[in-house]
Every structure is written in C-alpha cells, then in structure tokens.
Amino acid sequence: MAKVYYEKDVTVNVLKEKKVAIIGYGSQGHAHAQNLRDNGFDVVVGLRKGKSWDKANEDGFSVYTVAEAAEKADVVMILLPDELQPEVYEAEIAPNLQAGNSLVFAHGFNVHFDQVKPPANVDVFLVAPKGPGHLVRRTFAEGGAVPALFAVYQDATGVATEKALSYADGIGATRAGVLETTFKEETETDLFGEQAVLCGGVTALVKAGFETLVDAGYQPELAYFECLHELKLIVDLMYEGGLENMRYSVSDTAQWGDFVSGPRVVTEDTKKAMGAVLAEIQDGTFARGWIAEHKAGRPNFHATNEKENKHEIEVVGRKLREMMPFVQPRVKVGVK
C-alpha cells in the first residue's frame, strides 16, 4: 500500500523562503500559482507572450519570460504540455538552473523517458494533483483539497523529499493526502490508464456497442443514448462510491446483466491485450512513437482525429445534444 502524508507530517516548510516559478498558466498552472500564493509562497509566472501572460498579469502575478522566471527562482515547476517541455527546458530553463535549485513536474513522462535530462546538482521531484486545475483551485478555496502524488527522482541537496512535501502542502494537497510513488510508477500507470481504460478503452467500447446496435437495425439515436449518453450516469456512481455503489444504485436487471455479460465482453483476451499495451509503455515503444509523431508534425494524429470526428456516433451525438441545452462541453472542441 502507498505511504500517505498529511498536513501534520509537514512540520517545516523548507520552501517558504524560496521563490517559486510556475512555468505555464493553464489548467494546473493557474491553480498551483494561486494556491501557493494564498499559502504565503513567493510566486512568479514564466510564460511566452500571449493570452496566458495577460491573464496571469490580471490575476496579480509578476510575469516574466520562461528564461527570466527560471533565472530568478529557486524552484521551477514545469506545467506545460508534455510535448513542449523538452524544447522549452533546453532553451530557456536548463541554462538558468543553479546548484541546489529544484526542478519540479506534475507528470514524469519527459524525465522517465529521457527527454529532459536534469543536471546532477539540482533536486528533481514531481507533485501531481489527481484532478483538473479548476478542481484543485476550487476545493482549496473552500478549505478542502484534491489528493496528489509525489515522487523524488534526484536528491541533490538531501532534502528533496521535504521540498516535495512542502510544495504539496503549499497547493493544499496535504489536507486530503499525498501518496508517495516513483517517476516510473506515476508515468507508466498514468499512460496505461489513459490508453487501456479512460480514453482508448472507453472510446473503443462505446463505439463497438453503438455499431453493434446500429448494425442490428436499431435507430442510431437510441444506440447513442444507451452506449454513450448514459455512460456519465454510471461513471458518476462509480466515482462517488466505487463499483459497489453503482451496482447498488442500478436496477437488479442491470446488475445481473453486469454479472453475466460483462465478462463476455471484456475477456481474458482483453486483459492479454491490456498487458501488451502496458509492455509497450514500459519498454518505451509508445513514448518513442509519440515523440516521433510529434516531431514529424503529427500527420497520423491529425488524420485519425479527423476520421474519428466523422464517425456516425459523433454525427448523431451533435444533433441529439442540440435537444439538451443542459449538456455543454467544458472546452471548445477544435484542432489541437
């Protein structure tokens, strides 16, 4: 079982007198910066000119270029998309790191897969809230918190663990609990969850169910409701109380169908396929492929995205959602 740390375990905040640079001011960046500031930390924001720069300024932060922020800071938290981090790190952060500084991440991908190679004289750790930035900020403001993970990759000063816990405490995570892990474990489990279950697994399952009903002659609108729309109702029940809460809340007919039919859909062969996905994450195959795809301009990424957006389930869904004004996407769908 994971070791969990709480507020009572952070007896000395070793970062309170340090300057923290938050690199990026998106979902996580704004939450980290504001929570740390509210907890008395000296925070600056590092950005390139644009809307985020203006927003951080409006929120009362001193905003600098990434290089300037890194040069001023003792602690540099990189909250940029994975694929942008290596270039920004090499060009703007690495030249400004000093011995004893802390290089911090919210995801271990680039360090674990050697895309970012920190010098030996800095501490390297991650603090990863297990929720989106808006929730990290809102729960903090309400006096609560989102749990987080932390891991130490490199302890140059001898107090990297204390620094990581102080940072986690600064964003409020110790109120809920901070679980200790490693860069390897955080990275590999995060990627596996996305690919086999949360994104890849779920979308494939939803499309397969939709196609099965439509191919059997059922109206696509009903197939959409049964295989996609109602998924939120079930996931919310699991989110709130696990599988047992979902099974308790649905009808007995639905629960019996779960028991007798679920294992026929997700079979031992499915688990073997999941094992193959995990193996490709562990040996770096997935990372190498994604890095190469990004460097090539993402031709397969964009082609697949365009094709998927034309699937019948998407066409039907767009029409049905016009009937439900209470269903609104949190973000505007567009080209990445």
Curated annotation (Swiss-Prot):
Keywords: Amino-acid biosynthesis, Branched-chain amino acid biosynthesis, Magnesium, Metal-binding, NADP, Oxidoreductase
Keyword flag Magnesium: yes
Entry annotated with the keyword Metal-binding: yes
Record note on cofactor: Binds 2 magnesium ions per subunit.
Biochemical pathway: Amino-acid biosynthesis; L-isoleucine biosynthesis; L-isoleucine from 2-oxobutanoate: step 2/4; Amino-acid biosynthesis; L-valine biosynthesis; L-valine from pyruvate: step 2/4
Binding site for substrate: S251
Residues that, per the record, bind Mg(2+) 2: D190, E226, E230
Gene3D superfamilies named in the record: 6.10.240.10, NAD(P)-binding Rossmann-like Domain
Cofactor: Mg(2+)
Enzyme class, UniProt record, top EC level: oxidoreductase
Domain of life per record: Bacteria
Domain KARI N-terminal Rossmann: residue ranges: 2-181
GO biological process: isoleucine biosynthetic process; L-valine biosynthetic process
GO MF terms held by the record: ketol-acid reductoisomerase activity; magnesium ion binding; NADP binding
Catalytic reaction equation(s): (2R)-2,3-dihydroxy-3-methylbutanoate + NADP(+) = (2S)-2-acetolactate + NADPH + H(+); (2R,3R)-2,3-dihydroxy-3-methylpentanoate + NADP(+) = (S)-2-ethyl-2-hydroxy-3-oxobutanoate + NADPH + H(+)
A GO CC term assigned to this protein in UniProt: cytosol
Known EC number: 1.1.1.86
Catalytic site: H107
Residues that bind Mg(2+) 1: D190, E194
PROSITE patterns named among the record's database cross-references: KARI_C, KARI_N
Stretches assigned to the KARI C-terminal knotted domain: 182-327
Membership in a protein family: Belongs to the ketol-acid reductoisomerase family.
UniProt xrefs under NCBIfam families: ilvC, PRK05479.1, PRK13403.1
Main function: Involved in the biosynthesis of branched-chain amino acids (BCAA). Catalyzes an alkyl-migration followed by a ketol-acid reduction of (S)-2-acetolactate (S2AL) to yield (R)-2,3-dihydroxy-isovalerate. In the isomerase reaction, S2AL is rearranged via a Mg-dependent methyl migration to produce 3-hydroxy-3-methyl-2-ketobutyrate (HMKB). In the reductase reaction, this 2-ketoacid undergoes a metal-dependent reduction by NADPH to yield (R)-2,3-dihydroxy-isovalerate.
Stated name of the protein: Ketol-acid reductoisomerase (NADP(+)) 1
Organism of origin: Bacillus cereus (strain ATCC 14579 / DSM 31 / CCUG 7414 / JCM 2152 / NBRC 15305 / NCIMB 9373 / NCTC 2599 / NRRL B-3711)
